[in-house]
Swiss-Prot record:
Domain of life: Bacteria
Gene: argR
GO MF term set: arginine binding; DNA binding; DNA-binding transcription factor activity
Summary of the function given for this chain in its UniProt record: Regulates arginine biosynthesis genes.
Protein family: Belongs to the ArgR family.
PANTHER family: ARGININE REPRESSOR
Protein name stated in the entry: Arginine repressor
Protein source organism: Finegoldia magna (strain ATCC 29328 / DSM 20472 / WAL 2508) (Peptostreptococcus magnus)
Pathway(s) it belongs to: Amino-acid biosynthesis; L-arginine biosynthesis [regulation]
InterPro entries the record matches: Arg_repress, Arg_repress_C, Arg_repress_C_sf, Arg_repress_DNA-bd, WH-like_DNA-bd_sf, WH_DNA-bd_sf
GO BP: L-arginine biosynthetic process; protein complex oligomerization; regulation of arginine biosynthetic process
Subcellular location: Cytoplasm
GO cellular component terms attached to this protein's record: cytoplasm
Amino acid sequence: MKKYTRQRLILDLIEENEIRTQEELSDYLEAHGVRATQATISRDIKELRISKVQTREGEYHYAIIDTVHDSLNERLDKIFRSAVLTIKHNEDMVIIKTISHTATVCGMAITNAKLDNIAGILTGNDTIYITVEDKSGLEKLVSEIKSIIR
């Protein structure tokens, strides 16, 4: 198995499970058909910047600390808050007007928020069109988008 594939699997396993030790991680990997030495797992953990975090119960488990991603999301949210002029909707879609040349970046902020019920996002120069998967959830989606501004 290629290094990238193994490391992607490690990230997925850590996101989906509370893994407390390298031995436990090794067991999960083996359950997925991947054999890796303790040294390899240790190197992967270091390269992937995986840390141990404490739970409310005082136990420790591995977690992905993605400070670069968090920082980018914070900047996108800040741009979104300052660039959005109006948020309106009809029965089929949400229409967001932005300051000129900021719709694409604002669309990225919405995408990164991973909101439910979005079928697709189309951005222009100063307008974002969002289509929904389920019309009954449109009002909730509008509220979630507005919460990014607050």
